[in-house]
């Protein structure tokens, strides 16, 4: 592949990945609006087993939006490296959070706004440093990569881990440990992304007039994708049903993306020719997104704004009028009026907080 063509495909994949995030993030808002309209009409809610949402056009608009987003995401893997496309999936969470604050009147606190900003910055860093060229262009090359000893060892290890978690660890600890079902989804997800990548290459070859349907690998990838996605959906739904969504979402994003990046590094060798600064930049962007997603979800139910900051961090209007500027000064002035015993108690409290008094 020529350098110019590689960059052209890279930007097509980037555009498709970002478009996918917008459609998927917006789909949650449309479906939620439709469900809220049904609730106001007194219809039986979906959580109670009702299916009135099938008659609500907003819900269908959300479903079509999600379908369009998934198609765009599928196509993005055919043009851009998985190292770029998979982490950018976090932007759908960002889009959903921003739109919900405007259209669903769901308040986005200070932690959420900082998380959104960090996610944008992390995504930008990843786009700048991600590999620009594709290593695989045909199914024959894909077949050769799948037979690489390094990937065979990795795939065998992943299958063994998945089977152990499904049949041994899951039945015993799946109801109490959040990492069990998420681990199953994540390690299987590494295979599903590889299958999508291979099928994307097959579609490109098919459009070019090549006899792809006669290639057995195309059908193997399709069958593997169906099995992997079915398994992912099954165990992800179990995790969401048992544990809090605000905890499942960021942990799943971290585990899933890490699995995909590891698989891509071994199978497609996208990191092999990357300079050290690009590797560091890509990892830095990824960890920045992780922090942003964590802030966005972990503190979403906490009422916190700029007005909640400590008094010493904000401008005190009383200080301008010659009055005391902080609670510290109030406590400091009252210290002389405290009995000796209370002073020692204060020292003990200070010591428990890690601040030893001077002697």
Swiss-Prot record:
Instruction: Write out the GO cellular component annotations.
Output: early endosome; plasma membrane
Tissues with expression: Widely expressed. Expressed at high levels in the kidney.
Q: InterPro entries per the record? A: Mg_trans_NIPA
Induction (free text): Up-regulated by low magnesium ion levels.
Q: Which reaction does it catalyse?
A: Mg(2+)(in) = Mg(2+)(out)
User: Is-annotated flag, keyword Transport?
Assistant: yes
| Segments traversing the membrane | 10-30, 57-77, 79-99, 108-128, 150-170, 176-196, 216-236, 247-267, 279-299
The record gives the membrane topology as: Multi-pass membrane protein
What UniProt keywords are attached to this protein's entry? Cell membrane, Endosome, Ion transport, Magnesium, Membrane, Transmembrane, Transmembrane helix, Transport
Q: Which residues lie on this side of the membrane: Cytoplasmic?
A: 31-56, 100-107, 171-175, 237-246, 300-359
Would the keyword Ion transport be found if you checked this record's keyword annotation? yes
Q: Which GO terms describe its molecular function?
A: magnesium ion transmembrane transporter activity
Where in the cell is the protein located? Cell membrane; Early endosome
The chain's Extracellular topological domains, given as residue ranges, are: 1-9, 78, 129-149, 197-215, 268-278
- Gene Ontology biological process: magnesium ion transport
**One Pfam family per UniProt:** Mg_trans_NIPA
Main function: Acts as a selective Mg(2+) transporter.
- Family assignment? Belongs to the NIPA family.
Name of the protein? Magnesium transporter NIPA2
Species this chain originates from? Mus musculus
